[in-house]
């Protein structure tokens, strides 16, 4: 052992390693190897070494005997040849190895865990996720619970140690419950914040998709316009080809001898037949009906009451307006004697319709056909599909000069290109003796009402009046027959004479509904020209009406809206506003009306709810007062309203 101490002292490499040196270096490995070699040589040295202790020699002799056995030597050699992986597999099962591989997380990942500001631990959250077990829920432990309850009901002295221990236990239990309630409250708050973040992200995604849908509908409108253009040119080419073919078949080839013997004029009879006759009615050849191939759906995804667009259409009070479909064509008329056609998809004016010599009081657009009734006692028919209009025209010209889209309603309306509507007029209907106050057409039948106290039925195919209905005569006939309707009634609200004699009408096949200044609604049969029912209820002139298969809705200057049952002739529902009703229309869900305010009055028939929609609500926040709404139209939740200052607003409803 002394020799070992001497050898240990003579190693020059056995020195302390500085802090700056590497932990694993060449010098350290060499020193460690020499130490291991020296220690092993001393342990397994000659047994006959006189310097070693006798007990040590005896122990080493036994070890040598054991190591010389072949079985032990083969085992040692087998372990030496075994890799560490095989050694681990021999000690652990496959499930244990898989579990350790999945549960092990490297330190690099643990360093990136963000610091949580939550004061509750993961285990507390796990405890809080379990519901509380009440006595009613522990049916499988009924005996144990009863047993504990019986023990707890044993009398206990208030000052005894058992009572103090029980109170401490109850306090600890309640504190634990309070802590769990705090954890659950924090979890609920975190879930609410997470849901709010998801909702905000969904709103952002919804806005992006809405913009994409708007662009798709714009491209769709442009493509549909191009298709209609091609179809029109195709129809014209086909007509020319048919005329040329029929002319070639009707004109046989003749020789010079046959031509010299012909006693006819220089034109054949077939050519004369092709020439238009002088008395041919203007409506003989009705143009083709161009129907929309697609329907816009963008407005269906907006919240009700959202403003889509606002335009200054005119410089004066709007007297009439109508549109064919959402984001389609709109026609507006005003006291400035102008009639303008608009593209609602782009907010641009297509052109101005010229022909009337006075203001247009009423109009209707249906499938690109427009009928206008004016104070000059004439009715004009127009084909809007013949308008020269390019939906992408504003993209190729200077916006400061040629752009006709009005984002700001205070801007002045820009005149559209001249001659864009030159091919639109079809023909004029002239028979009334006074201004046209109401009209409605469906198919080839048009009915108009005038201040001359008559209703006229027109055949649009022949372009002439086929029947005249005298309202005063019908009222007199009802009086002579002793009808309960009574004679013509002069209502108190029409004493000033400002109300139209024929305020509104609608036709469907042979049925006609007409509202007049005496507050009565008369239902006519156009086949007989007689009134078969009169609806009495309004106390003021009827200004608007509309009916469907079951109900008829009327609006009057007596400030009321009445819904009639056409099957019984009785009032189904009625409600009133603060001002007279000047315009009304309904769709499948809503009844909208202009009632002398800066908003449109909306009645939801499904929910039975009244609400307001219009600039009066949005501008009130800016301390502004918009003009009064005079006219309103609605189709499929897409509403257009015209005001006294010439501004037109487009809304979702």
From Swiss-Prot:
Subcellular location: Mitochondrion outer membrane
Region (Disordered) location: 246-265
Broad class of the protein's primary localization: mitochondrion
GO-annotated biological processes: mitochondrial fission; peroxisome fission
Any Pfam family matching the protein: WD40
Record bears the keyword Mitochondrion: yes
GO CC annotations on file: mitochondrial outer membrane; mitochondrion; transferase complex
Coiled coil: 207-251
PROSITE patterns reported for this sequence: WD_REPEATS_1, WD_REPEATS_2, WD_REPEATS_REGION
Bias (Basic and acidic residues) ranges: 254-264
Placement of WD repeats on the sequence: 313-354, 355-392, 431-470, 491-534, 537-576, 578-613, 618-653
Record's keyword terms, sorted: Coiled coil, Membrane, Mitochondrion, Mitochondrion outer membrane, Repeat, WD repeat
SUPFAM superfamilies, per database record: WD40 repeat-like (SSF50978)
Membrane topology per record: Peripheral membrane protein
PANTHER family in the record: WD REPEAT DOMAIN 5B, WD40 REPEAT PROTEIN
Chain's role: Involved in mitochondrial fission. Acts as an adapter protein required to form mitochondrial fission complexes. Formation of these complexes is required to promote constriction and fission of the mitochondrial compartment at a late step in mitochondrial division.
Family: Belongs to the WD repeat MDV1/CAF4 family.
Protein name: Mitochondrial division protein 1
Organism of derivation: Neurospora crassa (strain ATCC 24698 / 74-OR23-1A / CBS 708.71 / DSM 1257 / FGSC 987)
Classification lineage: Eukaryota, Fungi, Dikarya, Ascomycota, Pezizomycotina
Gene that encodes the chain: mdv1
């Amino acid at each position: 052992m002394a020799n070992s101490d001497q050898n240990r002292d003579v190693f020059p490499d056995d020195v302390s390693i500085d802090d700056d040196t590497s932990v694993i270096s060449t010098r350290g490995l060499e020193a460690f190897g020499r130490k291991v070699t020296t220690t092993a040589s001393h342990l397994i040295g000659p047994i006959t070494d006189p310097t070693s202790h006798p007990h040590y020699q005896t122990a080493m002799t036994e070890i040598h005997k054991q190591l010389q056995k072949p079985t032990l030597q083969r085992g040692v050699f087998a372990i030496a040849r075994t890799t560490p992986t095989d050694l681990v597999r021999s000690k652990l099962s496959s499930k244990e190895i898989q579990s350790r591989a999945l549960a092990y997380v490297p330190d690099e990942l643990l360093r990136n865990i963000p610091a949580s500001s939550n004061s509750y631990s993961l285990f507390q959250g796990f405890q809080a996720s379990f519901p509380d077990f009440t006595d009613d829920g522990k049916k499988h432990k009924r005996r144990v619970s009863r047993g504990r309850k019986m023990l707890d009901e044993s009398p206990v002295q208030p000052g005894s140690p058992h009572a103090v221990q029980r109170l401490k236990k109850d306090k600890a239990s309640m504190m634990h419950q309070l802590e769990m309630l705090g954890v659950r409250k924090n979890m609920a708050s975190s879930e609410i914040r997470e849901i709010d973040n998801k909702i905000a992200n969904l709103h952002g995604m919804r806005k992006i998709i809405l913009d994409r849908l708007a662009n798709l509908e714009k491209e769709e409108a442009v493509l549909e316009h191009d298709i209609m253009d091609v179809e029109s040119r195709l129809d014209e080419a086909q007509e020319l080809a048919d005329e040329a073919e029929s002319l070639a078949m009707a004109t046989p080839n003749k020789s010079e001898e046959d031509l010299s013997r012909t006693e006819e004029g220089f034109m054949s009879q077939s050519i004369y037949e092709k020439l238009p006759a002088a008395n041919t009615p203007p409506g003989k050849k009705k143009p083709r009906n161009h129907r929309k191939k697609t329907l816009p759906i963008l407005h269906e995804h907006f919240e009700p009451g959202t403003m889509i667009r606002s335009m200054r259409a005119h410089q004066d009070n709007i007297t009439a307006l109508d549109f064919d479909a959402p984001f389609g064509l709109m026609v507006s008329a005003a006291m400035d004697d102008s009639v303008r056609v608009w593209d609602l998809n782009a907010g641009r004016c297509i052109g101005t319709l010229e022909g009337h010599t006075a203001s247009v009081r009423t109009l209707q657009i249906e499938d690109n056909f427009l009928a206008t009734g004016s104070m000059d006692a004439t009715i004009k028919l127009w084909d809007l599909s013949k308008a020269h209009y390019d939906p992408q025209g504003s993209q190729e010209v200077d916006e400061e000069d040629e752009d006709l889209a009005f984002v700001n309603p205070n801007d002045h309306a820009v005149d559209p290109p001249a001659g864009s509507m030159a091919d639109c007029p079809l023909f004029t209907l002239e028979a009334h003796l006074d201004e046209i106050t109401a009209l409605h057409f469906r198919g080839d039948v048009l009915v108009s009402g005038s201040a001359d106290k008559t209703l006229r039925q027109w055949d649009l195919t022949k372009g002439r009046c086929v029947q005249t209905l005298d309202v005063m005569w019908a009222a007199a006939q009802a009086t002579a027959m002793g009808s309960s309707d009574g004679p013509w009634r002069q209502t108190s609200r029409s004493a000033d004479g400002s109300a139209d004699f024929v305020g509104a009408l609608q036709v469907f096949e042979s049925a006609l509904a007409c509202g007049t200044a005496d507050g009565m609604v008369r239902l006519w049969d156009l086949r007989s020209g007689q009134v078969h029912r009169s609806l009495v209820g309004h106390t003021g002139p009827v200004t608007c009406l509309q009916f469907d298969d079951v109900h008829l809705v009327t609006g009057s200057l007596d400030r009321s809206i009445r819904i009639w049952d056409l099957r019984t002739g009785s009032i189904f529902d009625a409600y009133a506003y603060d001002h007279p009703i000047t315009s009304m229309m309904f769709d499948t869900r809503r009844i909208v009306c202009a009632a002398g305010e800066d908003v449109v009055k909306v009645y939801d028939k499904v929910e039975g709810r009244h609400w307001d929609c219009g600039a009066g609500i949005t501008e009130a926040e800016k301390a502004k007062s918009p003009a009064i709404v005079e006219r309103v139209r609605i189709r499929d939740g897409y509403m257009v309203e015209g005001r006294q200052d010439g501004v037109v607003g487009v809304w979702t409803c």
